[in-house]
């Protein structure tokens, strides 16, 4: 039995034709070139090397557009642009953009005002409503940040270690916040009320009323003085008259005058000095009612009286 040998024609990997291989192919790419030890040797002028570095998160079809963008940014070197991007395994250690990304990841510490607002929201809304606390009380933080801050706060409170620890923002507890609010309310209630602006300045007596001051100074004559009836004029003496141009002898009842002592002691009422104009008529009526006459002279000598009775004697009828 004779074995038949079957010869299979070789197919070129470059052009796809049979009868030759890629090394001896004269069609397409390897025209006028020879491949020696895996390297194509061609008589064509030397071209700039193509950048074949693998980009991260990019498809191979967009490499040309990316190179054009890198050249337009001013780098001018496509190889340097590819090296700057790096690979996935490199991370952001050797990348120029790594420092910026690392700074963005760095958190911003909480301030004391934010922590106190967090305590107020925790007191009103309770545990678990981190979204409501972030929305209504700590608007500068996200709900995730509020939840993380609350977790650290409760861990700090539950630690029973009595060793000296560094002062932290979490040492401000909810009881301290309530005590601060209570002290602020007490301070606001102790402030004196504002007096209305008027033309007359009122006396300021702190902690004492007028009755208390009067009781304290009981021995002083603080009552109103009684008004006595003036003496009527006799024997055509002119009565005391008012002098309108002199302020001592009259008082204007239309304008009340209030005197205030610096110690707060009330001052007695002002009493006008003088006599009314209708006083002479009242005095004449009083003289008519009394009926007293005063005569000075020698009395009439009675008959049969001794000389001892002849001396000057004043008789009142």
UniProtKB/Swiss-Prot annotation:
It comes from Arabidopsis thaliana. Probable transcription factor involved in somatic embryogenesis. Acts as a positive regulator of BHLH109. Keywords: DNA-binding, Metal-binding, Nucleus, Transcription, Transcription regulation, Zinc, Zinc-finger. Residues 77-111, 173-206 are annotated as: Disordered. Residues 94-108 have a biased composition (Basic residues). InterPro entries: Homeodomain-like_sf, Myb_dom, Myb_dom_plants, Plant_Stress_Dev_TF, SANT/Myb, SANT_dom, Znf_CCHC. Residues 185-206 have a biased composition (Polar residues). Residues 102-158 form the HTH myb-type domain. PROSITE patterns: HTH_MYB, ZF_CCHC. Residues 130-154 bind DNA. Coiled coil: none annotated. It is found in: Nucleus. The keyword Signal does not apply. One of its GO terms (biological process) is regulation of DNA-templated transcription. NCBIfam families: myb_SHAQKYF. It comes from the Eukaryota. A zinc finger (CCHC-type) spans 12-25. Residues 175-184 have a biased composition (Basic and acidic residues). This is Probable transcription factor At5g61620. One of its GO terms (molecular function) is zinc ion binding. PANTHER family: TRANSCRIPTION FACTOR KUA1, TRANSCRIPTION FACTOR MYB1R1-LIKE.
């Amino acid at each position: 039995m004779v074995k038949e040998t079957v010869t299979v024609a070789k197919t070129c990997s470059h052009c796809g034709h049979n009868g030759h291989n890629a090394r001896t192919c004269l069609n397409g790419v390897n025209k006028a070139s020879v491949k020696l030890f895996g390297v194509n040797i061609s008589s064509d002028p030397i071209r700039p090397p193509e950048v074949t570095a693998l980009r991260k998160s990019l498809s191979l079809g967009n490499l040309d557009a990316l190179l054009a963008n890198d050249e337009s940014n001013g780098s001018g070197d496509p190889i340097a642009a590819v090296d700057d991007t790096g690979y996935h395994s490199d991370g952001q250690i050797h990348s120029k953009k790594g420092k910026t990304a690392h700074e963005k990841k760095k958190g911003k510490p909480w301030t004391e005002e934010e922590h106190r607002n967090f305590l107020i929201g925790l007191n009103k809304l309770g545990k678990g409503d981190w979204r409501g606390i972030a929305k209504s009380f700590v608007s500068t933080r996200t709900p995730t940040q509020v939840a993380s801050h609350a977790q650290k706060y409760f861990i700090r409170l539950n630690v029973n270690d009595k060793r000296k620890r560094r002062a932290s923002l979490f040492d401000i507890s909810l009881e301290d916040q309530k005590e601060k609010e209570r002290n602020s309310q007490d301070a606001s209630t102790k402030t004196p009320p504002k007096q209305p602006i008027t033309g007359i300045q009122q006396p300021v007596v702190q902690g004492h009323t007028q009755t208390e001051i009067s009781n304290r100074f009981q021995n002083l004559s603080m009552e109103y003085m009684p008004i006595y009836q003036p003496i009527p004029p006799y024997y055509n003496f002119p009565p005391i008259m008012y002098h309108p141009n002199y302020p001592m002898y009259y008082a204007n009842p239309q304008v009340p005058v209030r005197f205030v002592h610096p110690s707060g002691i009330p001052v007695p009422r002002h009493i006008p000095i003088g006599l009314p104009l209708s006083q002479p008529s009242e005095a004449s009526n009083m003289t008519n009612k009394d009926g007293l006459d005063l005569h000075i002279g020698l009395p009439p000598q009675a008959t049969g009286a001794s000389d001892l009775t002849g001396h000057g004697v004043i008789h009142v009828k």
